[in-house]
């Protein structure tokens, strides 16, 4: 059995990382870590046989696909669990590494809010026991995918848990975008960007840009303009079986494609981005009981009294 561990690289997370590696190794499971954790002294001192992705041989574990200027990767061997130590960014990086594998993902919260990660550092012993015994529930969340066409040829595929966005590359510039739903042009906008978000991503960038909060089990896709110049350019909620096409009409090419907050590709005028819901779900492992409403109240510190 293999456990994949993602680490945010911060000193504060090292003791937690080392402890988890030791707990996992004590239960006769092998540990593969992401490159951020490969120089971690806490793990090396556990004598637990912890192996980084690079040490294990990247070609053995990784499917590499390089499209200038971004490089995407995914791991092509099975893991019984993935554990991230950090905030939402670390969790999202782990989800990307393990995409399309069906691996249950768990997050230990070392960040400020950590909306996607719900395990506190003091609960890591119980977490490992729950994983070993299979005592956890699974929430299946559908990702969002995008395919970029340039001059009639596909040049890039993208994947995200929360959102795929088209954004301006330079401050002070706007992005001109045509939005099509099922082949019908529904919006021509000048804006700072546009967000195509999943239900899971409704509490992330979409929320901060005026999009609605959507319960994660809802099968919908959100289209949310960022600071649009048009008066009636409002967020749209679509069933997840609708096709969404974005066409870049900006003339200066100062536009980028991002997934889960990371720049993946520089776009050009005329590029077309087709967005669809992914077919293979992301599996969130849960060891705590609780409803989404309670999670909202806690994470956003809502005043309910």
UniProtKB/Swiss-Prot annotation:
A Pfam family hit: NAD_kinase_C
Cellular component GO terms held in the UniProt record: cytoplasm
Active site residues of this protein: 88 (proton acceptor)
Cofactors demanded by this protein: a divalent metal cation
UniProt entry tagged with the keyword Kinase: yes
Principal location listed in the UniProt entry: cytoplasm
Organism expressing this protein natively: Tropheryma whipplei (strain TW08/27) (Whipple's bacillus)
GO process terms (BP): NAD metabolic process; NADP biosynthetic process
Protein name as it appears in the record: NAD kinase
EC number: 2.7.1.23
MF-aspect GO terms: ATP binding; metal ion binding; NAD binding; NAD+ kinase activity
Similarity comment text for this entry: Belongs to the NAD kinase family.
Amino-acid positions noted as binding NAD(+) in the UniProt annotation, renumbered to this chain: 88-89, 93, 162-163, 173, 192, 203-208, 262
Membrane-spanning parts: none
Role summary: Involved in the regulation of the intracellular balance of NAD and NADP, and is a key enzyme in the biosynthesis of NADP. Catalyzes specifically the phosphorylation on 2'-hydroxyl of the adenosine moiety of NAD to yield NADP.
Stored SUPFAM superfamilies: NAD kinase/diacylglycerol kinase-like
Keyword Transferase part of the UniProt annotation: yes
Enzyme class: transferase
Cellular compartment(s): Cytoplasm
Keywords, alphabetical: ATP-binding, Cytoplasm, Kinase, NAD, NADP, Nucleotide-binding, Transferase
Catalytic activity entry: NAD(+) + ATP = ADP + NADP(+) + H(+)
């Amino acid at each position: 059995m293999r456990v994949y561990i993602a680490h945010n690289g911060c000193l504060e997370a090292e003791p937690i990382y080392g402890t988890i590696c030791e707990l996992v190794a004590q239960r006769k499971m092998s540990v593969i870590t992401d490159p951020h954790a490969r120089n971690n002294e806490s793990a090396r001192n556990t004598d637990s046989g912890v192996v980084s992705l690079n040490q294990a041989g990247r070609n053995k574990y990784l499917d590499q696909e390089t499209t200038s200027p971004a490089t995407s990767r995914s791991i092509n061997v099975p893991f019984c669990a993935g554990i991230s130590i950090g905030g939402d960014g670390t969790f999202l990086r782990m989800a990307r590494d393990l995409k399309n594998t069906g691996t249950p993902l768990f997050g230990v919260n070392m960040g400020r809010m950590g909306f996607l990660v719900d395990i506190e550092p003091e609960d890591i012993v119980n977490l490992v026991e729950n994983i070993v015994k299979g005592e956890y529930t699974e929430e299946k969340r559908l990702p969002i995918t995008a395919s970029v066409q340039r001059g009639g040829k596909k040049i890039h595929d993208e994947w995200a848990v929360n959102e795929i966005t088209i954004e301006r590359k330079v401050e002070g510039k706007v992005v001109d975008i045509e939005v099509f739903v099922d082949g019908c042009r529904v919006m021509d906008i000048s804006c700072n960007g546009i967000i195509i978000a999943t239900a899971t991503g409704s509490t992330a960038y979409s929320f901060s840009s005026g999009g609605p909060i959507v319960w994660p089990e809802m099968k919908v896709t959100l289209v949310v303009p960022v600071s649009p110049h048009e008066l009636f350019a409002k967020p749209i909620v679509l069933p997840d079986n609708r096709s969404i096409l974005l066409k870049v009409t900006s003339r200066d090419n100062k536009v980028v494609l991002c997934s889960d907050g990371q720049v993946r590709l520089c776009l050009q005028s005329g590029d077309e981005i087709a967005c669809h819901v992914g077919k293979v779900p992301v599996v969130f492992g849960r060891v705590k009981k609780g409803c989404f409403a309670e999670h909202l109240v806690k994470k956003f510190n809502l005043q309910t009294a």
